[in-house]
C-alpha cells in the first residue's frame, strides 16, 4: 500500500516539477541575451527573424551532438535563423571545442556569471529556445529534438 501511495504521489508531483523546470512560456517574451563577451568577438550583427538560444556545457556529450545538428539546420535555413550558444564556461576552456562551430549564423555568448542561465532557469542541457524577432518563445526543449520542419512550423 505504501508503494502505491508513494508512486501516486510521485506521479502527481512530476508534472508540477516539469512545469517549473524552465522559466519561460511559449508565446511570452523571454529574457534578453545580454552578455559582456562573445567568443572571438562574434556578437550577432543584426537580429534575424528567428534566433535559437542554445544552452551548452562541455561536460555533456549531447551538447556537442546538438551543435552538429544545429550547424546542419543553419546550413539548410541560412539567414532565416541565427543560433546563439550560451555557455557558463570560460573562453580558454571552450574556445577549442566551440570555435569550429562559429559562422555567420552561429555565435557563442560567454555567460561566465551565469546570469542568462539563471534568467531562463535552465535545469538541464542541451536545452534551447526558439525566439522570434519580438523576443517571444516559439518552441523550447531538448535541442536534439529540433528540426528544420519544427522551426518552419513554429515561425508561421
Question: Residues of each region from the PLM?
Answer:
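Bacterial N-terminal signal peptides
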Residues: 7-15
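Thiol-/selenol-based redox modules, centered on thioredoxin-like
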Residues: 130-156
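Short, internal strand/loop/helix patches
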Residues: 84, 100-129
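Structural microenvironment flanking redox-active thiols in thiol-disulfide oxidoreductases
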Residues: 64-101, 116-118
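Short pre-active-site segment immediately N-terminal to redox-active cysteine/selenocysteine motifs
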Residues: 49-51, 56-60, 124
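N-proximal helix/coil linker or "cap" segments that precede and/or mark the start of modular domains
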Residues: 15-32
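A short beta-strand-turn-helix
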Residues: 29-51, 68
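Positively charged n-region of N-terminal signal peptides that target proteins for export
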Residues: 1-4
Amino acid at each position: 500500500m505504501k508503494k502505491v501511495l508513494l508512486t501516486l504521489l510521485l506521479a502527481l508531483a512530476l508534472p508540477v516539477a516539469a512545469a517549473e523546470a524552465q522559466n519561460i512560456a511559449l508565446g511570452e517574451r523571454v529574457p534578453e541575451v545580454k552578455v559582456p563577451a562573445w567568443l572571438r568577438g562574434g556578437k550577432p550583427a543584426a537580429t534575424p527573424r528567428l534566433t535559437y538560444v542554445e544552452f551548452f556545457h562541455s561536460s555533456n556529450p549531447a551538447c556537442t551532438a546538438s551543435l552538429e545538428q544545429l550547424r546542419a539546420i543553419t546550413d539548410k535555413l541560412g539567414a532565416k535563423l541565427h543560433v546563439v550558444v550560451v555557455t557558463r564556461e570560460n573562453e580558454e576552456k571552450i574556445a577549442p571545442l566551440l570555435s569550429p562551430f562559429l559562422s555567420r549564423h552561429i555565435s557563442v555568448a560567454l555567460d561566465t556569471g551565469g546570469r542568462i542561465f539563471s534568467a531562463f532557469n535552465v535545469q538541464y542541457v542541451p536545452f534551447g529556445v526558439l525566439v522570434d524577432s519580438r523576443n517571444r518563445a516559439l518552441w523550447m526543449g531538448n535541442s536534439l529534438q529540433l528540426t528544420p520542419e519544427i522551426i518552419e512550423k513554429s515561425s508561421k
